[in-house]
Design a protein with these regions (language model features):
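C-terminal regulatory/interaction module of P-loop NTP-utilizing enzymes
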Residues: 1-219
Length: 219
Protein backbone atom coordinates (compact mmCIF):
# COMPACT_ATOMS: atom_id res chain seq x y z
CA UNK A 1 0.00 0.00 0.00
CA UNK A 2 2.82 2.42 0.85
CA UNK A 3 4.41 2.03 -2.57
CA UNK A 4 1.07 2.59 -4.32
CA UNK A 5 0.39 5.76 -2.33
CA UNK A 6 3.88 7.06 -3.06
CA UNK A 7 3.37 6.40 -6.77
CA UNK A 8 0.05 8.23 -6.65
CA UNK A 9 1.59 11.21 -4.85
CA UNK A 10 4.76 11.07 -6.95
CA UNK A 11 6.89 10.60 -3.83
CA UNK A 12 10.23 8.81 -3.97
CA UNK A 13 9.98 5.52 -2.05
CA UNK A 14 13.03 3.62 -0.79
CA UNK A 15 12.06 0.06 0.09
CA UNK A 16 14.36 -2.09 2.22
CA UNK A 17 13.52 -5.76 2.66
CA UNK A 18 14.57 -6.64 6.19
CA UNK A 19 16.13 -10.02 7.04
CA UNK A 20 17.92 -11.43 10.05
CA UNK A 21 21.21 -10.47 8.35
CA UNK A 22 20.30 -6.81 7.71
CA UNK A 23 22.76 -4.59 9.56
CA UNK A 24 24.00 -1.02 9.90
CA UNK A 25 26.13 -1.34 6.77
CA UNK A 26 23.08 -2.33 4.70
CA UNK A 27 20.93 0.44 6.13
CA UNK A 28 23.12 3.47 6.73
CA UNK A 29 25.92 2.79 4.29
CA UNK A 30 29.49 1.61 4.13
CA UNK A 31 32.69 1.53 2.17
CA UNK A 32 32.59 -0.19 -1.22
CA UNK A 33 35.37 -1.16 -3.60
CA UNK A 34 34.76 0.71 -6.86
CA UNK A 35 37.34 0.65 -9.66
CA UNK A 36 40.04 -0.29 -7.21
CA UNK A 37 39.15 2.55 -4.85
CA UNK A 38 37.48 2.31 -1.45
CA UNK A 39 34.51 4.67 -1.63
CA UNK A 40 31.80 5.46 0.88
CA UNK A 41 28.26 4.84 -0.36
CA UNK A 42 25.15 5.97 1.49
CA UNK A 43 22.67 3.27 2.39
CA UNK A 44 18.96 3.54 1.55
CA UNK A 45 18.10 5.05 4.92
CA UNK A 46 20.58 7.90 4.55
CA UNK A 47 19.63 8.42 0.91
CA UNK A 48 15.95 8.70 1.84
CA UNK A 49 16.83 11.14 4.63
CA UNK A 50 18.84 13.38 2.33
CA UNK A 51 16.21 13.32 -0.41
CA UNK A 52 13.24 13.84 1.91
CA UNK A 53 11.80 10.59 0.59
CA UNK A 54 9.68 7.82 2.05
CA UNK A 55 11.53 4.94 3.68
CA UNK A 56 9.72 1.59 3.74
CA UNK A 57 11.17 -1.04 6.08
CA UNK A 58 9.46 -4.15 4.77
CA UNK A 59 8.89 -7.11 7.14
CA UNK A 60 10.73 -5.36 9.96
CA UNK A 61 9.87 -8.15 12.42
CA UNK A 62 12.23 -10.43 10.49
CA UNK A 63 15.17 -8.29 11.61
CA UNK A 64 17.58 -8.55 14.52
CA UNK A 65 19.00 -6.22 17.17
CA UNK A 66 21.14 -4.72 14.38
CA UNK A 67 18.14 -2.54 13.55
CA UNK A 68 18.69 -0.56 16.73
CA UNK A 69 21.00 1.68 14.71
CA UNK A 70 17.77 3.25 13.43
CA UNK A 71 16.69 4.58 16.83
CA UNK A 72 17.68 8.23 16.22
CA UNK A 73 16.17 8.08 12.74
CA UNK A 74 12.84 6.87 14.14
CA UNK A 75 12.91 9.69 16.69
CA UNK A 76 12.94 12.18 13.82
CA UNK A 77 16.46 13.27 14.57
CA UNK A 78 19.53 13.02 12.41
CA UNK A 79 21.99 10.16 12.41
CA UNK A 80 25.75 10.21 12.91
CA UNK A 81 27.71 8.18 10.38
CA UNK A 82 30.61 7.27 12.63
CA UNK A 83 32.66 5.64 9.87
CA UNK A 84 33.05 8.96 8.06
CA UNK A 85 32.35 11.36 10.92
CA UNK A 86 29.33 12.93 9.24
CA UNK A 87 26.04 14.05 10.73
CA UNK A 88 22.98 13.67 8.48
CA UNK A 89 19.82 15.65 9.20
CA UNK A 90 16.59 14.49 7.54
CA UNK A 91 15.27 16.75 4.81
CA UNK A 92 11.68 17.97 4.88
CA UNK A 93 9.21 15.26 3.93
CA UNK A 94 11.29 12.33 5.16
CA UNK A 95 8.90 9.69 6.47
CA UNK A 96 9.39 6.16 7.77
CA UNK A 97 6.96 3.28 7.34
CA UNK A 98 7.43 -0.32 8.42
CA UNK A 99 5.42 -3.45 7.71
CA UNK A 100 5.21 -6.40 10.09
CA UNK A 101 2.88 -9.38 9.88
CA UNK A 102 3.12 -9.92 13.64
CA UNK A 103 3.21 -6.25 14.70
CA UNK A 104 6.58 -6.98 16.27
CA UNK A 105 5.29 -9.65 18.65
CA UNK A 106 6.59 -12.74 16.87
CA UNK A 107 4.68 -15.77 15.60
CA UNK A 108 3.76 -18.48 18.10
CA UNK A 109 1.78 -20.57 15.64
CA UNK A 110 4.58 -20.76 13.07
CA UNK A 111 2.62 -19.00 10.34
CA UNK A 112 5.36 -16.37 9.98
CA UNK A 113 8.53 -18.37 10.49
CA UNK A 114 11.61 -16.24 11.08
CA UNK A 115 9.84 -13.37 12.77
CA UNK A 116 10.81 -12.45 16.30
CA UNK A 117 9.71 -10.31 19.19
CA UNK A 118 11.00 -6.81 18.50
CA UNK A 119 12.66 -4.54 21.01
CA UNK A 120 9.93 -2.64 22.85
CA UNK A 121 11.93 0.60 22.71
CA UNK A 122 12.00 0.40 18.92
CA UNK A 123 8.30 -0.41 18.71
CA UNK A 124 7.57 2.57 20.93
CA UNK A 125 9.17 4.85 18.35
CA UNK A 126 6.43 4.08 15.84
CA UNK A 127 3.67 6.47 16.99
CA UNK A 128 0.91 5.02 14.81
CA UNK A 129 0.02 1.42 13.96
CA UNK A 130 -2.39 0.72 11.12
CA UNK A 131 -3.92 -2.69 10.56
CA UNK A 132 -4.57 -3.25 6.87
CA UNK A 133 -7.72 -5.35 6.34
CA UNK A 134 -8.44 -7.22 3.15
CA UNK A 135 -10.14 -5.09 0.48
CA UNK A 136 -13.90 -5.05 0.11
CA UNK A 137 -15.33 -7.37 -2.54
CA UNK A 138 -15.86 -4.43 -4.89
CA UNK A 139 -12.28 -3.22 -4.51
CA UNK A 140 -10.86 -6.73 -4.77
CA UNK A 141 -12.83 -7.31 -7.96
CA UNK A 142 -11.29 -4.16 -9.46
CA UNK A 143 -7.84 -5.50 -8.53
CA UNK A 144 -8.56 -8.77 -10.33
CA UNK A 145 -9.89 -6.97 -13.40
CA UNK A 146 -6.79 -4.80 -13.48
CA UNK A 147 -4.68 -7.97 -13.20
CA UNK A 148 -6.25 -9.18 -16.44
CA UNK A 149 -9.43 -10.96 -15.41
CA UNK A 150 -11.82 -10.06 -18.24
CA UNK A 151 -14.50 -12.47 -17.00
CA UNK A 152 -16.66 -10.44 -14.61
CA UNK A 153 -18.50 -13.50 -13.29
CA UNK A 154 -15.21 -15.26 -12.51
CA UNK A 155 -13.90 -12.21 -10.65
CA UNK A 156 -17.14 -11.93 -8.67
CA UNK A 157 -17.08 -15.64 -7.82
CA UNK A 158 -13.45 -15.48 -6.67
CA UNK A 159 -14.02 -12.52 -4.37
CA UNK A 160 -17.15 -14.05 -2.83
CA UNK A 161 -15.31 -17.36 -2.35
CA UNK A 162 -12.34 -15.72 -0.66
CA UNK A 163 -14.64 -13.74 1.64
CA UNK A 164 -16.25 -16.98 2.88
CA UNK A 165 -12.83 -18.53 3.51
CA UNK A 166 -11.62 -15.47 5.42
CA UNK A 167 -14.74 -15.42 7.57
CA UNK A 168 -14.20 -19.11 8.34
CA UNK A 169 -10.56 -18.40 9.22
CA UNK A 170 -11.42 -15.60 11.64
CA UNK A 171 -14.05 -17.83 13.26
CA UNK A 172 -11.47 -20.57 13.73
CA UNK A 173 -13.09 -23.03 11.33
CA UNK A 174 -10.05 -23.26 9.03
CA UNK A 175 -6.32 -22.74 9.58
CA UNK A 176 -5.46 -21.13 6.24
CA UNK A 177 -6.57 -18.08 4.32
CA UNK A 178 -6.76 -16.97 0.70
CA UNK A 179 -5.14 -13.57 0.22
CA UNK A 180 -5.69 -11.01 -2.50
CA UNK A 181 -2.25 -11.91 -3.82
CA UNK A 182 -3.34 -15.54 -4.21
CA UNK A 183 -6.46 -14.47 -6.10
CA UNK A 184 -4.25 -12.54 -8.51
CA UNK A 185 -2.11 -15.69 -8.85
CA UNK A 186 -5.23 -17.64 -9.77
CA UNK A 187 -6.11 -15.09 -12.45
CA UNK A 188 -2.56 -15.24 -13.83
CA UNK A 189 -2.62 -19.05 -13.88
CA UNK A 190 -5.98 -18.99 -15.65
CA UNK A 191 -4.57 -16.67 -18.32
CA UNK A 192 -1.69 -19.09 -18.88
CA UNK A 193 -3.57 -22.41 -18.85
CA UNK A 194 -7.05 -21.30 -19.90
CA UNK A 195 -8.70 -23.53 -17.28
CA UNK A 196 -10.29 -21.93 -14.22
CA UNK A 197 -10.53 -25.10 -12.13
CA UNK A 198 -6.94 -26.02 -12.90
CA UNK A 199 -5.76 -22.51 -12.05
CA UNK A 200 -7.52 -22.61 -8.68
CA UNK A 201 -6.23 -26.10 -7.87
CA UNK A 202 -2.66 -25.16 -8.77
CA UNK A 203 -2.73 -22.05 -6.59
CA UNK A 204 -4.16 -24.02 -3.66
CA UNK A 205 -1.59 -26.81 -3.96
CA UNK A 206 0.63 -25.28 -1.26
CA UNK A 207 -2.01 -26.11 1.38
CA UNK A 208 -2.40 -29.55 2.97
CA UNK A 209 -4.78 -31.97 1.23
CA UNK A 210 -7.67 -31.48 3.67
CA UNK A 211 -7.52 -27.69 3.40
CA UNK A 212 -7.17 -27.81 -0.36
CA UNK A 213 -10.21 -30.07 -0.74
CA UNK A 214 -12.25 -27.94 1.67
CA UNK A 215 -11.44 -24.76 -0.26
CA UNK A 216 -12.18 -26.41 -3.60
CA UNK A 217 -15.53 -27.67 -2.33
CA UNK A 218 -16.40 -24.16 -1.13
CA UNK A 219 -15.76 -22.84 -4.63
Amino acid sequence: MVEQVCAKLKRECYRVNITRQTDEDDLLGGFRLINGQTVWQDGPVVTAMKQGGVLLLDEIDLGSANLMCLQPVLEGKGVFLKKIGQWVTPAAGFTVFATANTKGKGSDDGRFVGTGVMNEAMLDRFPVTLEQPYPTKATEKKILVKAGCDDADFATHLTAWSEIIRKSFYEGAVDEIVSTRRLVDIVNAWQIFGDKSKAIAMCLARFDDDTKEAFLSLY
